[in-house]
Amino acid sequence: MNMANFLRGFEEKGIKNDRPEDQLSKEKKKILFSFCEVCNIQLNSAAQAQVHSNGKSHRKRVKQLSDGQPPPPAQASPSSNSSTGSTCHTTTLPALVRTPTLMMQPSLDIKPFMSFPVDSSSAVGLFPNFNTMDPVQKAVINHTFGVSIPPKKKQVISCNVCQLRFNSDSQAEAHYKGSKHAKKVKALDATKNKPKMVPSKDSAKANPSCSITPITGNNSDKSEDKGKLKASSSSQPSSSESGSFLLKSGTTPLPPGAATSPSKSTNGAPGTVVESEEEKAKKLLYCSLCKVAVNSLSQLEAHNTGSKHKTMVEARNGAGPIKSYPRPGSRLKMQNGSKGSGLQNKTFHCEICDVHVNSEIQLKQHISSRRHKDRVAGKPLKPKYSPYNKLQRSPSILAAKLAFQKDMMKPLAPAFLSSPLAAAAAVSSALSLPPRPSASLFQAPAIPPALLRPGHGPIRATPASILFAPY
């Protein structure tokens, strides 16, 4: 079937007929007969039809039809009705099932596919198990039905105290349980509590009688108030003297507001200080003496019962083998009223190990060292090996060294000498046996001088004695 010749003749006939009705019929016929049923391709012009009919794919399909074999369905993109067109555009339907284009498109103005909106919720509703599907299946359904699921925002986990961001909950949990976070939280709590405590002291200074505000109609209460006011006024001028006495004794100075309350001065002050430190440690979960942060009260109790904490307490009190001494020039720092663990500005001496340290950090390092632990446990000292020999003070070892050197200074046996000297030494030992070997090897003149004549070379007649000595 020669389609190109048929279309040429059809165009020549159309050129002769110039009427508008003939032109419309010509366009319709062109649409009808510009479709290749063999290759299932829509052609837009006679030139395309000619190029297609001369192509290899069209000839191959025509040959297969003539031989009685069904042609394979052509696979191409669905955009076959493009204006430019190509030689091999097809749709997914086979040639036998596909209807002519004119029947599907009554006019050229109608679009080939009508777009209709697809509701994403209804599309997801078609699949009841959409949320439990695999990610690959969800992606396929979203691509085919146009369901757009908004991407989930990554949850940002951050610590506002430490100014850190985390990638997971486990990282955040580990950070919250750590010591760095606990220290920063405690520092923030301390800064928040300080402004609350300062105005109370200032108010106590400004109004010394503010603690005696309740006034009743009884005369006895008024007399008690007057007595307390007198006691407070008398205690104010003597506060400087008591402060200087406390500084001389080496204890921590009391704040100036503490002198106004007579109950604090009369009662036992050190007991209340220890209790306040314990309460602060329980509240903050922090040991200010050892500078250790814990996560629970059980850990704090275990730390307080440990040997390190006990030795630090003994060093502060001076009751154990570790003694503390004030460092020179530390009184000026103590006058500033800086509160701490009580171990600042001090030097320490460990009586067990006979070691002097200069600071609290060095004391902690010494307490945690193996040397101190072995001494406390009563283990013997391990010898230290060094490449340098130190002079030992004991006279017995020095005497042994001298005796060893004298023994090594004895002359050598003749077997260690060269061959001519060895023969001479053997003859002399056979003829004369002296009681003690002297510095010279040959004493008796029994050997003729011809044997002792110096030979050629480096051999000498009377060589010096060879001695072995330590390095």
From Swiss-Prot:
The keyword Zinc is assigned to this record: yes
Keyword Electron transport: no
This protein's UniProt keywords: Apoptosis, Metal-binding, Nucleus, Repeat, Zinc, Zinc-finger
Gene3D superfamilies hit by this protein: Classic Zinc Finger (3.30.160.60)
Region (Required for induction of apoptosis): 1-93
Bias-annotated ranges (Low complexity): 76-92, 230-250
Segments of this protein annotated with the region Interaction with p53/TP53: 94-471
Compartments in which it is found: Nucleus
Biased composition (Polar residues): 206-220, 260-269
UniProt-listed GO biological process terms: intrinsic apoptotic signaling pathway by p53 class mediator
Span of zinc fingers (Matrin-type): 34-64, 157-187, 282-316, 348-378
Tissue expression from the record: Detected in germinal center of lymph node (at protein level). Expressed in spleen, lymph node and tonsil.
Function: May play a role in p53/TP53-mediated apoptosis.
Self-association and partners: Interacts with p53/TP53; the interaction is direct.
Name assigned to this protein: Zinc finger protein 385B
Gene: ZNF385B
